[in-house]
């Protein structure tokens, strides 16, 4: 056990984490040069394309150190993006130390900071590493000072390397051996193993990545999943070198995989504890929290006969993504679909893109909403994630909206823009600290404002330099109302949205004007109204097309024309009573665009 080192890498997007891991694998000879592929660990096409890491992965490498000993390095890859922070906290729970990789040109970013604090809270040893020193704009001295100033860990003797050219990678390996402590655990205690991640393999069933905290797990052992209480047999155990390699047992402190032929991922929830079926441990390992979706949206297939395929696709996707939540939903305008819960906007985009790409579905997504806490007049509290489920106004005592604490790091020349944006989004400033050239601002913002377009706006007002990290803190009472769109007096459920009372005039007007352009003209007038409760706040009318019924009369008496015009008038009146209006799909999409 003295020769095991478990570590993960904390880094902001694009600071070179995946490239560094490629180098470590190459130096330790995990893959031959021919098999080496850039970003080995990002196995999803989407991960490669966007250059981000989504799922946690692990690799076990043997490294012969300068002191002549062979060390087993277990490296657990973590995502760097704010939406996947739960994946990060889980990866960190399996380690004793973390490498803090910072781009020597760009310096510290907000998400790096957030994940770094998570690591320090878990009592991990954080080892700073300055990457990309081959770049002309690299300034390792300044960045080292910035790490000390902002993160508060000693960084003057931080290892300097360039993962791309391979300079200094050996020093990184030495520092892992020297600075990161070996795992602690009792090999003779009952088995306790943390599930870091699970994914679904078409041939093997569910593959779980585990870290053995105490005891050991042998091939053929019967084990129990603690949260569900079910027993399974370990058909295969082993490690990734990145290639899957079978072993006879996983010992204390090691990280590896277990395959038990499970059919669905919920049988081995991520973050859960495994123990032996006989003489098992009494209590699970700490740190298992069920992850709650923060953002909900209705998703509908464009053609209704795709519904079955859509359902299968979601089921398959949720095999790999334990944080995905979905339930069937039907809408009078869009047909049958699902209400899907996501961790955040990036997660939402990625899920939608994977559905469209891997399963060839064409989908429409309604505007994302957050979960509101509603206190009813009869005293009960309900949670609502869909605007059309909101009770009538007179039954609501008060509405509370979720508030997030957003930590923003921004260069000081853009501070003014960022503050203006936060105020416009109804934020309250909590804290502001200057660190050299960067400013760390903390705001409490309504989550509904953050999920709409906050991130994009933040990036554009700061020319891409600001970085954001947020987490949910509490529900606060707020004056929120539901804005309905009525077409000829009928509510269109897919267009309802929950917004703050101060925005309703502006939003209502913009919506009805937009709808007016998109709904095709009929033979009768169509009234488009925006309403809150029973109060109409904006209206526009799509004028009727007129057929010239008097064209065939020339000359003659005026009463003849009057008769024809009156007949037309009667007909229009009748049509207006029975005619219903098809709302084209462009109209729905336009409303979603309007939020941006």
UniProtKB/Swiss-Prot annotation:
SMART domains the UniProt entry points to: EFG_C
Is this entry keyworded Cell membrane? Answer: yes
Fetch the Pfam families from UniProt: EFG_C, GTP_EFTU, GTP_EFTU_D2, LepA_C
| Keyword entries, A-Z | Cell inner membrane, Cell membrane, GTP-binding, Hydrolase, Membrane, Nucleotide-binding, Protein biosynthesis
Q: Example GO biological process term?
A: positive regulation of translation
A Gene Ontology cellular component where this protein is annotated is: plasma membrane
Family matches, as SUPFAM superfamilies: EF-G C-terminal domain-like (SSF54980), P-loop containing nucleoside triphosphate hydrolases (SSF52540), Translation proteins (SSF50447)
Query: What is this enzyme's class at the first EC digit?
Result: hydrolase
Enzyme Commission number(s) of this protein = 3.6.5.n1
Q: Which reaction does it catalyse?
A: GTP + H2O = GDP + phosphate + H(+)
Family label? Belongs to the TRAFAC class translation factor GTPase superfamily. Classic translation factor GTPase family. LepA subfamily.
UniProt protein name:
Elongation factor 4
Q: Which organism is it from?
A: Shewanella putrefaciens (strain CN-32 / ATCC BAA-453)
Q: What lineage does the source organism belong to?
A: Bacteria, Pseudomonadati, Pseudomonadota, Gammaproteobacteria, Alteromonadales
